[in-house]
């Protein structure tokens, strides 16, 4: 259904209009009307075929003369039947007032002209280019992209609307629209497979879940990668019903089959799982064992499994709320009491004014499944804590005001929720290239430190809140801090300096060294694996790389590079021991260092608000050809299973849910709709 754009109804100045036996000259901005329409305020020049005829003005196409008495005639509008004076005896009123009537007053004619303009345009343009198949395809895309139900094609109001826009479109049935959806899904899948086959680096996978109202669980797999232009992408690969009976082995096999279908086994870098330790520990181990057996995982799978950062933040937040659930109940009931009656609300506001309480927060009830709304409810309630207490003295039937001790618990809980809320917003606010893996380390180490300090806090209230949540996040930190650290080390603004600083805060100056060494060793081992792989990019002539026995390319940091003759090059094949020796000593004060050493030793890049880490690596690819390949894959690790632009404030179980309509569809149709919606967003 193409958008209709009416043709202009005003011709250019001095354009000659021919028709109906007369010629109309349009002057200035005078309006012309096509067909039987009148050229208003235009000079009418009789044509040869009309000379000598009575009433040469085209106005008489819109009026008829009616004799009303002897010598008196009136002009009757043929459109609205209004009667206008024309002549009385020998006196003639002329036609100017008749022209004004047609141009300005006759509503019937105006409505008819509007309809004719649309019909004329529609018949001369739209019908000529109308394509039933194309319109059906666009209808299917509209349904996919807007989450409309397939049975919209049967809804009377929609049918009426389509008929008014394009009467020639023959509405299709549900079966036909399903076929269109599948065709779009298969076409877009083929495009994505071709794109993934040509990306320069590895691909990381996310595994999420969707629940339904029928207690059926779907598994969603998405790929994240950085393309040749150093742009970060995430694409859904598959949405499948969880195997039944559900088991960790069955889920592992389903994921492996998906990797095989997409030819991704050899390109897989990491896999990010939702934070459900009870099952994911098992099937992540299954996946690691299977893929490590084929020798396709980097670092032998040590950094293969990553836990979802958004999930752990949600789990910790719900843990904080659980520690004060009794107080939350009292606050909810108090707000309900206040909002239930205008008199209660007015009295509440009156007390707040008397107490000179000024707050930008307004009382509101929360959505119990979204912890951020509960946090905002508690935050507002804290501002008015004195009002809640005084309100009891005015109403005998109000008895749910929190106590002083209760407010102390809420204040402590909000201290932790403030951090969690800010960190979660950081994930949601990251757009496009900015949700790279390096951005997660900062918030994670701060939260780990805060929870550690909370465990040792002298206040029983704070310690009571932290006890329930520290174990959850500590498990995440132990599993993922090395991956997080490697990622932030690939940020030239921080490198290993940020890791050293954070670890000294968390572990203390003495113990920090051994944890820093773990990260140092992991980065070096990972770099060696990339260095041992074939170089994919041409080297800059300034940086001359040589690959010794340990697989590390070395860069000569001083002096001019020598030009080797063929005989010298051949002899070089037997100098492996010498190359290894050079890697350990310096010659003539000119050390040989590999790219990783040079990168880490260089001064930190200045921190600016608009810094783009991917742009930095793109600009420095020739300087660090091997390290940039490693950085491309590391920065593409999805630390969260939640995509950009999606809400990360999840229910306590950490799962998203399908709506009732999609829950009722066949699994293959659910997959086609969800995958195609994701892919169509990026189609030209």
Swiss-Prot record:
PROSITE patterns: ZF_BED (PS50808). Keywords: DNA-binding, Metal-binding, Nucleus, Transcription, Transcription regulation, Zinc, Zinc-finger. SUPFAM superfamilies: beta-beta-alpha zinc fingers, Ribonuclease H-like. Pfam families: Dimer_Tnp_hAT, hAT-like_RNase-H, zf-BED. A zinc finger (BED-type) spans 54-113. It comes from the Eukaryota. GO terms for biological process: post-embryonic development. Residues 595-680 are annotated as: HATC (Hobo-Ac-Tam3) domain. It is found in: Nucleus. Zn(2+) binds at residues 77, 80, 101, 106. One of its GO terms (cellular component) is nucleus. Transposase-like protein that is essential for plant growth and development. May regulate global gene expression by recruiting other cellular factors. Homodimer. This is Zinc finger BED domain-containing protein RICESLEEPER 4.
